[in-house]
Structure formats: structure tokens, C-alpha cells
Amino acid sequence: MSEQTTAGLPKAIFLMGPTASGKTALAIALRQALPVELISVDSALIYRGMDIGTAKPSAEELALAPHRLLDIRDPSEAYSAAEFRRDALVEMAEITRRGNIPLLVGGTMLYYKALLEGLSPLPSADPEVRQRIEQMAGEAGWEALHRQLCDIDPVAANRIHPNDPQRLSRALEVFFISGKTLTELTKISGEILPYDVSQFAIAPASRELIHQRIEQRFHQMLASGFEAEARALFARGDLHTEMPSIRCVGYRQMWSYLAGETDYDDMVYRGICATRQLAKRQMTWLRGWKDVHWLDSEQPDAAYSRVLQVLSAKPG
């Protein structure tokens, strides 16, 4: 939206960036200087009992800057972009009513997109249709279903790996329910966000620095008890790798290790690689993002000053 169309709207701030880029530290610093309240935009931080492997803000950090939308789901539960949009809008309205500015911080870019642009009118999940797809997969295999999706919706099929049953079944389910492809329906936008948003992205200047930060943080997680945390989840017996919670980077690789499918060193290597792949996807999203102010995570003081400078230059 242009400045003209956002005139008179309440203000909001987006602080985006790849994993391990220093978003939380900057958000906490801004909380000390501005009338902001924080909302987490992270599909992993919603889960209770998944603290170390998700790099959830510590108790000390949360005391300085409480985050909304943390610990709102059990790991056995799913949480959609539509649910995030609904919940975030409620939190943003409450913060605005209190005379403060919502500061949304995190790296789940799909959530930001859903919030900014609204959601496409996708049909709700249908257990009967999903069961039929599962049955087809049991008989013919997921690769056969992927070939079927290639015929129905080649654009979606090109994006979805044959070994990703969750996304594959959803793409087929949408078509079987609505008669329209996922690609067709996602071109239809929903309601635009009724806020004047200032958007910032913080990231290291080079890919090597991102990789270095990710490796350091993964080893820190292990030293802080990540394996014990994952073992407690594994021991529950009701969680598995098809669930969004256990598909989170680090947890999926730890699950394979705990199941005896891989050794410790391989788990560490795969966990770091998966986190690097996540950061790469996040950076791909961000490079195509409009109206974003870039910040260098290697210069936190300059990043902090830049945010204050941009915000003070805005009218209102």
C-alpha cells in the first residue's frame, strides 16, 4: 500500500529475517526504546515443550519483552496460516487499543504473506477426501499420486516433492473438493492488512556468515539439552514425523537418530544442513519482498539506529 492509502491507519512493524540472524535481540532492544509489543511470527515457536530446538526466547528475554503467540499449541496439533492470521489480527487490535504498536518478529514468511495479503479461498480439510487420498497412496504409492498431480496441476507438482505427503495430499485434496487447482486458487487474494506497516529484514551480509551462525547455534542447542528435550517428545508415543511439529528442522533429524535410523554425527550434520536449507528458503522469500528495509545482523547497533531512523521519518 502507498503512503496515501495507509494514511490514518494504525502502525505496525515487521521484523523478518532468516533463522539465526539476530531478530530476537533486535526486537528486545526496540521494546526498550519504543511503545511496541511483540508478536511471534514463527510456525515452530507455537509449540509447547519445544524450546531448545526452536531457539525460543529464554525466560530472561521474555521477561524483558513478552511475545504473544508463543506456546499456543501442543506438538500433536496443527496450526495453519489462516489460524495465524486470525490470531495475529486479534493480538494486533488489542495492542493498538492499548496505545502501542504491534512489532511482529519471526521468520515464517508464509505467515507474513497471509497477514499482508489475506488468504486465498482454499477449501477446509475434508477427512473423507483425505482418507481416500491416503488409501490411494497405500495402494499405488506417493510417487504415483505425484504423477497424477503433475497432470492436474503441474505448477504445484513442480514445487512439491514426491516424498512430501502432507503437501502432496493437500494439493490433491483442494482439487478433489473444489474442482480447481491449488495454483488457480492461490492467485485469488483475500483481505489486505488494515495497518500502515514498516517492514525490516535483518540478515548477515554473506551466505557464509549465515552458515557459520547456524552451525554455532545448532551446537549451542545440543549443549543446552536439545537431545533430552527431543527424547521427552519421542517418549510420548503420540508424535511422528508426518506432524508439522516434528517436521521442524532439527527435530526431524533428531527423531531419525532416536529411532536408530542414523548415528549422532550424521544427525548433527543433517540438522545443520536442514537449517541452512531453511535459511536459504527464507532469503529467497525476502529477496522478492517489496518495501523492505535491509539491516546487517553483523552490525546490531547500526541496525537498531536504522529502524529508529526509518520509523521517525514516517508521518503520524
From Swiss-Prot:
Gene Ontology molecular function terms on file? ATP binding; tRNA dimethylallyltransferase activity
In the record, the note on similarity to other proteins reads:
Belongs to the IPP transferase family.
List ligand-binding residues for substrate: 19-24
Give the residues the record marks as binding ATP: 17-24
Name recorded for this polypeptide: tRNA dimethylallyltransferase
Site annotated as Interaction with substrate tRNA: where? 108, 130
Q: What does this protein do?
A: Catalyzes the transfer of a dimethylallyl group onto the adenine at position 37 in tRNAs that read codons beginning with uridine, leading to the formation of N6-(dimethylallyl)adenosine (i(6)A).
Documented EC number(s)? 2.5.1.75
For this UniProt record, the keywords arranged alphabetically read as follows: ATP-binding, Magnesium, Nucleotide-binding, Transferase, tRNA processing
Tell me the segments the record calls region Interaction with substrate tRNA: 42-45, 166-170, 247-252
InterPro entries membership:
Dimethylallyltransferase, IPT, P-loop_NTPase
Q: Which PANTHER family match?
A: TRNA DIMETHYLALLYLTRANSFERASE (PTHR11088:SF60)
- Which Gene3D superfamilies does UniProt cross-reference here? 1.10.20.140, P-loop containing nucleotide triphosphate hydrolases (3.40.50.300)
Identify one Pfam family in the record: IPPT
Question: Per its Swiss-Prot or TrEMBL entry, what cofactor is needed?
Answer: Mg(2+)
Instruction: Name a biological process GO annotation.
Output: tRNA modification
Reaction equation(s) it catalyzes: adenosine(37) in tRNA + dimethylallyl diphosphate = N(6)-dimethylallyladenosine(37) in tRNA + diphosphate
Q: How does it assemble?
A: Monomer.
EC category: transferase
